[in-house]
Amino acid sequence: MASALWTVLPSRMSLRSLQWSLLLLSLLSFLVMWYLSLPHYNVIERVNWMYFYEYEPIYRQDFHFTLREHSNCSHQNPFLVILVTSHPSDVKARQAIRVTWGEKKSWWGYEVLTFFLLGQEAEKEDKMLALSLEDEHLLYGDIIRQDFLDTYNNLTLKTIMAFRWVTEFCPNAKYVMKTDTDVFINTGNLVKYLLNLNHSEKFFTGYPLIDNYSYRGFYQKTHISYQEYPFKVFPPYCSGLGYIMSRDLVPRIYEMMGHVKPIKFEDVYVGICLNLLKVNIHIPEDTNLFFLYRIHLDVCQLRRVIAAHGFSSKEIITFWQVMLRNTTCHY
């Protein structure tokens, strides 16, 4: 009996080892085939931003505005305009912002306007969704939309739309911020920060990313091809969670966008334009003003930040309500 058992166990162990070996061999074969199927490009170590530049504005986008703000911003002089990228189906996210950090239109007498940036829903869109979006715009008048397809890979087109809209329809805004629907903005802190600046020209700030490497791996959301971006390192840029700029930079960046082919990552794209314009990013002295990665913030931390990324609509409402309470913070 014991002898038979010892005979069976090694055979089972051998079978299991064989199975693992075959699995690893299959995985290795897949990786080799995947690597061989890739076009082989040499990563360019030394960056030359003129690689992206065309002398004629051949990349000027001519998409049409299908929805615009109700109020005529060209006749206003807002201190700050906040432009929020949003997907057509993100109704709850937009509403959460409208009743929290985007609700108040004046801070200490300084006008702050908030608008949402959208593309068109896919061709097979729910007609009820399209209708409700029209109704939403009639009700709030804060949606800006063009007729390009609203997809993740078209985020750069949405950013170009933002720069065009400010240039053509809201040129008097002293400062402009671009952000996303999953970002918590402490609007009061943002206004205070801008009021305390020593200069109001050639100013661009946010969460700085310096010497950030281009990713060539499997994860499609952060992958960029060699054809699209051949350099090893991205330019200095500010994360798309929220970057802020002075009025004078908006038309200059928008004009440059007509000469630079859009790439997948809108924040990197803006960084390329800034480098071509020889504009340096302003790095905040306080490193806790912008949070790129999701962290567990308490109310006292939220009172110190300008922008924190990774919040759901429900969390934005909850944290905003908590932040407004008379809680004593010992800094």
Curated annotation (Swiss-Prot):
Hey, which pathway is this one from? Protein modification; protein glycosylation
This protein's record includes keyword Glycoprotein: yes
Q: What is its main location?
A: Golgi
Which residues point to the Cytoplasmic side? 1-20
Reactions mediated catalytically = a globoside Gb3Cer (d18:1(4E)) + UDP-N-acetyl-alpha-D-galactosamine = a globoside Gb4Cer (d18:1(4E)) + UDP + H(+)
**Membrane topology (UniProt):** Single-pass type II membrane protein
Q: Which InterPro entries would you find in this protein's record?
A: Glyco_trans_31 (IPR002659)
Carbohydrate attachment sites? 72, 154, 198, 212, 326
User: Which keywords appear in this protein's UniProt record, sorted alphabetically?
Assistant: Glycoprotein, Glycosyltransferase, Golgi apparatus, Lipid metabolism, Magnesium, Membrane, Signal-anchor, Transferase, Transmembrane, Transmembrane helix
Q: Tell me one GO molecular function of this protein.
A: N-acetyl-beta-D-glucosaminide beta-(1,3)-galactosyltransferase activity
Q: What does this protein do?
A: Transfers N-acetylgalactosamine onto globotriaosylceramide. Plays a critical role in preimplantation stage embryonic development.
Task: Give the protein name, as stated in the record.
Answer: UDP-GalNAc:beta-1,3-N-acetylgalactosaminyltransferase 1
Source organism (scientific name): Pongo abelii
Q: What is the lineage of its organism?
A: Eukaryota, Metazoa, Chordata, Craniata, Vertebrata
